[in-house]
Regions:
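Long, well-ordered alpha-helical scaffolding segments within enzyme catalytic domains
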Residues: 143-147
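N-terminal accessory segment detector
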Residues: 2-117, 122-142, 152-175, 183-184
Length: 184
């Protein structure tokens, strides 16, 4: 134990500033922050669902995602120095920096100058529900808002098509898949 000038007694091995953390510790912190964000999102949703029902919860969730996905895309673009209109390369880069990317397993394939397919191979929310014996969460209507507005924020020319997303039947190794196409 030591006494700091402010009179705070600390155990030196537990006091640390973010700026002093190693790369591995910072990546762990980012993963924890992503998990915390998702836990809050889930708890908020369940609270609304319990009080007002699933339809109201889904409606409010869509409304929140309409705003959040744009904020997230803009912040990622600013952090990476990406200007709007960057097409497929900008979208692929930004998808890697979403909060989901730190806690889910995802991939981008079928990449061309005008099209790509994004797949969520492991989804923390859906896999938790599966472990609890619950049915797939029907997130398609929210996902359509989330992914289409995320892509349009990066490049307004994007058209987004849902290839599969619960409640749709899906393969065991893909929870959802989205096709992004640049229109002329």
């Amino acid at each position: 134990m030591s006494h700091h000038p402010q009179g705070i007694v600390t155990n030196e091995c537990t006091m640390k500033d973010v700026k002093d953390m190693s790369k591995e510790e910072l990546l762990g912190l980012l993963e924890d922050a992503s998990k915390n964000w998702l836990a809050h999102d889930g708890l908020w949703f369940r609270a609304v669902e319990n009080r007002y029902g699933i339809d109201a919860a889904m409606d409010l969730d869509r409304n929140a995602w309409e705003k959040f996905t744009v904020i997230e895309a803009k912040r990622i673009m600013k952090r990476l120095g990406i200007e709007p209109g960057g097409g497929i390369p900008a979208l692929i880069q930004c998808l890697k920096f979403r909060l989901y990317a730190h806690i889910n397993v995802q991939e981008v394939s079928e990449v061309s100058n005008s099209r790509c397919v994004f797949r969520m191979n492991k989804c923390r929310v859906q896999e938790a529900r599966k472990r609890q014996g619950l049915p797939d969460f029907p997130c398609k209507s929210v996902g359509i808002v989330e992914y289409s507005l995320f892509a349009k924020t990066i490049d307004p020319r994007f058209k987004t098509k849902c290839l599969v997303c619960p409640p749709d039947p899906h393969p065991d190794d893909v929870w959802c898949a989205w096709e992004f196409t640049l229109s002329a």
